[in-house]
Amino acid sequence: MGLEKSLILFPLLVLVVGWVQPSLGKETSAMKFERHDVDSDSSSSSPTYCNQMMKRREMTKGSCKPVNTFVHESLQDIHAVCSQKNVKCKNGQTNCYKSRSALRITDCRLTGSSKYPNCEYKTSQQQKHIIVACEGNPSVPVHFDASA
């Protein structure tokens, strides 16, 4: 009797573990936003900041990401943007929000002569309002839409 139960339960356990396990290591949209767009610990004073960060944050694997923006504010302040002014996203969606005040950002743009795998970026420090797409409950940033 015990062996029969084991023979029934074991395949079921294998199915459940096989189904749940891949989702444990999967990067959520909010996690990807943080990896791509948040650098609270830095103010990017180095002209090589973008070259270093784009590589470190895995945005130069397989190809050079043409443009990226890093926000140099606390995660709490960036999350707070999701409760600020609702604006239309560049793609027409209505889940974007604009920060009330200008935030410290670094704009990274691929230089014209740069070719993969040698991705070279121009680093530009700015103070601008940010626009982020937010999702979930509680609402958190999932995409950097623009700066203004």
From Swiss-Prot:
Disulfide bonds join 50-108, 64-119, 82-134, 89-96. CDD domains: RNase_A_canonical. Its EC number is 4.6.1.18. PROSITE patterns: RNASE_PANCREATIC. Keywords: Disulfide bond, Endonuclease, Hydrolase, Lyase, Nuclease, Secreted, Signal. It is found in: Secreted. Pancreas. Pfam families: RnaseA. It comes from the Eukaryota. Endonuclease that catalyzes the cleavage of RNA on the 3' side of pyrimidine nucleotides. Acts on single-stranded and double-stranded RNA. This is Ribonuclease pancreatic. It comes from Peromyscus leucopus.
